Each structure stands twice: as C-alpha cells, then as structure tokens.
A protein has these predicted regions:
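Acidic/histidine-rich catalytic cores of soluble enzymes
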Residues: 2, 30, 72, 137-262, ...
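Conserved, mostly hydrophobic/aromatic
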Residues: 5, 22, 30, 62, ...
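Active-site beta-loop-alpha junctions enriched in small/polar residues
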Residues: 6-10, 33-37, 74-77, 113-115, ...
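Active-site acidic/histidine proton-transfer and metal-coordination neighborhood
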Residues: 17, 61-64, 78-193, 270, ...
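Glycine-rich, proline-tolerant flexible connector loops at the mouths of alpha/beta enzymes
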Residues: 33-57, 112-119
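C-terminal helical cap(s) of enzyme catalytic domains, especially alpha/beta-barrels
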Residues: 296-316
Length: 322
C-alpha cells in the first residue's frame, strides 16, 4: 500500500515547494485538486488540456521527485438545483476525466451530488428519514429523476475515457453509505466506485471495517482518504450525531474530525489497512487534514508517522509454513 496526501493541504506553498515537501516527508503519491471545493491551485484544467508541453512539464515535476498522482479531485454538486453550479460541476468533472485519461491517472474523486426537493427548488434537500412521507417522495424524485440519469451518462463517459470515478461517501449528498454507493453502482457501471473515507462513516455509526468488506467484495473501492473522527459520547447524548454546531465548537460538538490516530488507535488503523488489502484494495492511503486543534504541519506529520508505523508496504511471502 502506498501513502499519499491531498495537496489541498499545502495551498500556502507553490507547486514545486509542495512537491519537495511531500517527497521529503517520505510519501509516494499526491492527490491533486482540479476545481470545485478542492480548488485548482496546482492544476489548471484548461491550460493542461490545451497544451501538451505543459502537461509534460507538470508530470515531470512530479515524477522527478519519485511521486505519482493517486487521483484528481473535483468534489462538487453536478445535480445541484442551482443550474449554474450544476453546469460548472459537470464541466469540471468531464474536463478532469479527460485530463486523467491523457496523463494516465486512473481515478477521479468527487461527490455524487444532491438535488432539490423538486424541479422548482432553489436549494438542496437531503432527506434522511422516510416519514413524514414527503421526504420519501423527495428521495425517490432525487434518485430516479436526477441522480441515476446523470450518473448513467457520466459513467459511460468515464468508461469511454477508461477512468474510474471514486465517489466520496459524504453527508449531505445522496451517496453517503455503502448501500447508496452500491445502489448507484448497480444503476450505472463498474467505473463508479467509492472514495472511502472512514471519518465520514464513524460518525454515521458505520463500522469502516464492515464497509470495507461490503464494498471491497464488490470491487467498489477506487480510492481511500485517511482521516479520523473523534466521537464524544457525552455530547452525542445532548446533540445527537446529526449535530449542526459549527466545526469550531470542538468542546461541545458530538464528533470532530481528527488527524489519523487521534480519533482511533493505531491498532484500528492497522486493521483498516489489513482489511483493505484482504478485500482487494491495495492502492493508496491519501492523507487529509481537517483537525481543528492541530496545525496542518503537525497534523500531517502525525498522520504520516501513524500510517507509516502500521502500513503494509510489501507483497506477502509464499506461505512456506502452510
């Protein structure tokens, strides 16, 4: 398994300095934002799509440092009820897929998207309860009239380009659980899979180990984000897991994103890595940092330290003992 990092952490650096820092930290891969929520500081889509020399220079800067691109990322909302947002998200995603094809980057990370309640809606609506029944009506509308038609078309485009799409299982979007991931995959094709981030599973009450087994057995894990979550049970008792307090209210929030090893022990992370490999995923652990009580530098380095201590780098030996 390789260890990488989402380069959005280092937008305070220029491209070359960022690459130097990642390489000096002993990592193997970088995940590069191309637009949407991650931004595009290090990767200007139109420039690279239009100019082969710039593409070659871009890749040379990366490979000269012994690094590879694990994936491009353009997390956004391609089925937004805001037509401008939806159009921009779709265009960015398709351009990113085209660039990935040109540069032999195997996967593009994004969100599934979330629609409004109906065709007249101006804002997204995320139904998470079947009753009152209006929510079930909204849910069916979003899946059958918005999500599936969009992704059926996009999945065929991804297949034509031979680029996998890794949808992050994230709250606020229709695909946020193993079930919804497999539901969309069944309605599209095998190019649609998961960008599995355990931090978004823990707070939903989903065991990441079980999710890895479910999705891995379906060959549906395309990318992995390494980020932790701390659950404060006393605060859960007050606010519930659907806590709407700002992320900065760490003392009172029910749960908080943490750097790897500060929500769950290294033993848990060792089990996660083992189960990923056992269930068919042996690609990259891409570090994210959204820890509210650590600097980016400290959080990143501690995540590196924890993951390096429990990672499985080599292929297994022949079972000479069996």
């Amino acid at each position: 398994m390789k260890i990488g990092v989402f380069s959005v952490l280092f937008y305070d650096k220029n491209f070359e300095d960022m690459l130097d820092y990642v390489a000096e930290s002993g990592l193997d891969m970088i995940e590069v934002g191309t637009g949407g929520n991650p931004g595009d500081k290090f990767c200007k889509l139109d420039e690279l799509l239009e100019n082969e020399d710039k593409r070659q220079a871009f890749m040379k800067s990366i490979t000269d440092r012994g690094l590879q691109i694990s994936g491009f990322s353009c997390h956004n909302n391609p089925i937004s009820p805001d037509p401008i947002e939806a159009k921009e998200a779709d265009e960015t995603l398709r351009k990113t897929i085209r660039l990935a094809n040109l540069l032999d980057v195997p996967v593009v990370n994004t969100f599934s998207g979330i629609a409004g309640s109906d065709d007249t809606a101006k804002k997204p609506n995320w139904p998470v309860t079947p009753w009152p029944t209006a929510y079930s009506v909204i849910y069916d509308y979003q899946w059958n009239e918005k999500l599936i038609p969009y992704w059926q078309d996009l999945a065929e485009f991804a297949k034509e380009q031979d680029v996998k799409i890794a949808i992050e299982l994230h709250a606020g979007f229709l695909v946020h659980t193993p079930y919804t991931m497999l539901k969309l995959r069944e309605a599209t094709n095998e190019y649609i899979g998961a960008n599995l981030d355990p931090s978004h599973l823990w707070w939903q009450g989903i065991d990441p180990i079980a999710a890895i087994r479910i999705l891995g057995q379906a060959n549906a894990i395309h990318h992995f984000h390494a980020k932790d979550t701390y659950i404060n049970q006393e605060n859960v008792n007050m606010y519930g897991l659907t806590d709407m307090q700002p992320y900065g209210n760490v003392a009172t929030r029910a749960w908080t994103f943490r750097t790897v090893g500060y929500g769950h022990s290294p033993y848990v992370w060792a089990d996660i890595i083992s189960q990923l490999i056992i269930n068919g995923y042996d690609y990259v652990l891409s570090i994210e940092h959204e820890d509210p009580i650590m600097s980016v530098e400290e959080g990143f380095q501690k995540a590196c330290q924890t993951l390096k201590s429990v990672n499985i780098y080599d292929k297994p030996a022949d079972m000479w003992w069996a």
